Amino acid sequence: MTNSKVDDFTRLIKTGGSGMKFTEGYWEKNERANASYAMQAFTAEAIPGGMRIVSPFREINDRGGALDVGTITTEFTSIRKDIISVRSYHYEGYVKGEPRYELNEDPQETEVEITDSEAVMKAGRMTVRVDLKDFKITYEADGKVLTNIGFRNLGYMQYDRATLTKFPEPNYMAAQYQPYMVTELSLAPGECVYGLGERFTAFVKNGQVVDIWNEDG
């Protein structure tokens, strides 16, 4: 390799190349991402217009297991006929930093049933089913399974995390990082994921690979 090619290769490795942002494949985590995944639907409750579950980053089997563990809260609500809105967050802040716009909502009646083994919300033809034993969220339409979320499919990422310090520094008693929420949905052979808005990718998102040649791309 020439020096320029070696530099390009080194840069590709350090930045994760054109692969996934948080993982290298399914099992290997990117060294720049500190990942925490929802491992259990520990609590479930009905809320106005839907239901809410709280999922810790590890299974809680006794009181000691509830110490020093983060959580992801997920809310399911009906915003229009046959549409279920899903919102997941980790310790919601007072200030909304992400771009938001007003939605044209027409909330419908929902039915929520919570047992020892599962929590179910029905909104028209749509149903969301949460397994309270083994973490799994299943979405159904007219009784047919559409997709689901399971092991390591819902997570909170701390990207480029710098540990805190007790010295008078900018990160005094506060770790510095870029926070992200991630989720993955199961797909059957032949199913496609579509998307709009990106200028440099295909309309069908399955298995996309994005090559960027300019460093400022």
Feature map (PLM): residue ranges:
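A low-complexity, Ser/Thr/Gly/Pro-enriched, surface-exposed linker/loop concept
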Residues: G17-D62, D68-A119
